[in-house]
């Protein structure tokens, strides 16, 4: 059997940053990916981060909402988010945006 490799240029990324007084208060990344199964891209939400001084002020929610808006604007047919934590409160946080636990992620650090 022979294996062929095809280089695909079908990935792009958008960093959404919340800025307060010229400083980054929080961020989230949206990666847009295309595969051969769908005409539209899908979104991958990663690295939602809020500086400690801005915790419990709704900034994380605003960042996720901005990512969802951008994913829709980019024509994504779905949005996937992952987390290193499986805390119940984190599942609740994402569920309020319609992001529900779906399957299992497998990972190998390289």
Language-model region placement:
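Conserved GNAT acetyl-CoA-binding A-motif
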Residues: 71-83
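Short beta-strand-to-coil "C-cap" segments at the C-terminal boundary of structured domains/repeats
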Residues: 106-110
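A conserved beta-turn-beta hairpin within the catalytic core of GNAT-like acetyltransferases
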Residues: 35-45, 102
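Conserved active-site alpha-helix within GNAT-family acetyltransferase domains
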Residues: 61, 85-103
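Acetyl-CoA-dependent GNAT
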Residues: 1-39
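Hydrophobic adenine-recognition pocket in adenosine-nucleotide-binding enzymes
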Residues: 48-50, 83
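Conserved acetyl-CoA-binding loop-helix of GNAT-fold acetyltransferases
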Residues: 50, 56-69, 96
